[in-house]
């Protein structure tokens, strides 16, 4: 796993895993029974012999993995995914190459492993059903009906079909590769950071668990900043896959294809404080 901003990145896959808003064409209807008949017919034509699971998703393709088996009790699911509508149009993907092929690639976006929170109230019922029986390393493609986008849980399939879902989307085809499972996502992140540090930052230091730094130039003044001081810095933000996602340097931005003419590339102000929680980044620059 190679994402460093776990709190921020968690929100992205959760939006896909909880809302699961695919864009199927012309089959959306308030009558779930009618939609179900449409999906049965679509599967019968395109995937003869495939029948729905007990909950109601259609597993279209399955490449088994050999690692740990998914268990809903596992708190975190680490996965790659691609979402398509019934015509095959991609609405969302973590696959960089695929994104480039379809013209939706954005150099500032993160592509790769995403983290979903498992279980009721967090993961959509249809995604949980897709993951059931999967092992780490496996890839599964399934058609998930729109009524299984809910994070609520009911006793049987008919209960899901009867319920109306607020802001319900259309049914979609989800291809998911299960890359890992964990009850301790912090350890996963720390292990990834330590591996990165050993590979790219020889001589790295740490002042606390989970914080690593490498001094590339000694300061000319080692006196501590006063709490009312504003300092100005340049920075470049990089994910653990080496992808640059933000910078104050225009040349660096151009090099990594994230330059924007609407952005001002200048040192940013840091308002110092007595504790780390008091330290704030401001929008002001040194020549404002």
Positions of predicted regions on the chain:
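Sec-dependent bacterial lipoprotein signal peptides
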Residues: 1-23
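Cross-family detector of peptidyl-prolyl cis-trans isomerase
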Residues: 23-288
């Amino acid at each position: 796993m190679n994402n460093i901003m776990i709190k921020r990145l968690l929100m992205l896959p959760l939006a896909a895993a909880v809302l699961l808003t695919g864009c199927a064409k012309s089959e959306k209807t308030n009558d779930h029974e009618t939609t179900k008949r449409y999906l049965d017919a679509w599967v019968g034509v395109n995937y003869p012999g495939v029948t729905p699971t007990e909950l109601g998703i259609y597993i279209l393709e399955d490449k088994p993995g050999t690692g740990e088996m998914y268990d809903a009790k596992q708190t975190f699911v680490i996965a790659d995914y691609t979402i398509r509508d019934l015509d095959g149009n991609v609405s969302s993907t973590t696959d960089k190459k695929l994104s480039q092929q379809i013209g939706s690639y954005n150099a500032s976006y993160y592509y790769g492993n995403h983290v979903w929170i498992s279980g009721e109230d967090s993961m959509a019922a249809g995604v949980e059903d897709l993951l059931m029986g999967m092992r780490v390393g496996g890839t599964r493609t399934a058609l998930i009906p729109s009524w299984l986008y809910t994070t609520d849980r009911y006793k049987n399939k008919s209960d899901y079909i009867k319920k109306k879902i607020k802001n319900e989307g259309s049914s979609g085809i989800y291809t998911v590769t299960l890359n890992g499972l964990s009850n301790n996502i912090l350890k996963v992140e720390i292990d990834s950071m330590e591996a990165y540090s050993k590979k790219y930052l020889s001589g790295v230091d740490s002042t606390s668990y989970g914080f690593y730094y490498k001094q590339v130039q000694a300061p000319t003044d080692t006196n501590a900043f006063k709490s009312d001081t504003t300092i100005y810095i340049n920075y470049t933000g990089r994910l653990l896959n080496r992808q640059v996602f933000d910078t104050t340097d225009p040349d660096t931005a151009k090099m990594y294809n994230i330059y924007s003419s609407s952005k001002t590339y200048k040192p940013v102000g840091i308002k110092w404080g007595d504790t780390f929680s008091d330290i704030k980044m401001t929008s002001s620059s040194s020549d404002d």
